[in-house]
């Protein structure tokens, strides 16, 4: 099963730590997987930093941008309650 939730983060980001806690908790409650991606590392680092650098942390659900800066747990639960697109 592939992760429905992607969390884009970067090192030293305190909001990223807060977002990770929310994403971990909600995904665990619903039996969903999530993937965390450091936008400063890997072959796509430049493109991801250009796209999301000012909005980090960013969450995607089913490949679509869902939230940035802060993750609302109720909104995330609602999005994950829908069937994947």
Question: Language-model segments: which ranges?
Answer:
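Long, contiguous secondary-structure blocks with strong helical propensity
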Residues: 1-4, 32, 82-83
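Generic recognition of short, well-ordered alpha-helical segments
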Residues: 18-21, 47, 51, 71
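Local sequence-structure signature of Cys/Sec-based thiol-disulfide redox active-site neighborhoods
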Residues: 1-25
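Structural micro-motif
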Residues: 50-59
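Non-catalytic, surface beta->alpha helical segment in thiol-disulfide oxidoreductase systems
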Residues: 61-85
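Thiol-based oxidoreductase modules, predominantly thioredoxin-like and allied folds used
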Residues: 32-44
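Short helix-loop-beta junction
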Residues: 27-30
């Amino acid at each position: 099963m592939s992760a429905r939730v992607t969390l884009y983060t970067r090192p030293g980001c305190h909001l990223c730590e807060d977002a990770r806690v929310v994403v971990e908790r909600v995904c665990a409650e619903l039996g969903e997987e999530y993937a965390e991606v450091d936008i400063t590392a890997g072959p796509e680092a430049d493109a991801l930093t250009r796209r999301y650098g000012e909005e980090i942390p960013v969450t995607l659900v089913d490949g679509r941008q869902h939230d940035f800066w802060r993750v609302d747990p109720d909104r995330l639960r609602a999005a994950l309650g829908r069937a994947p697109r």
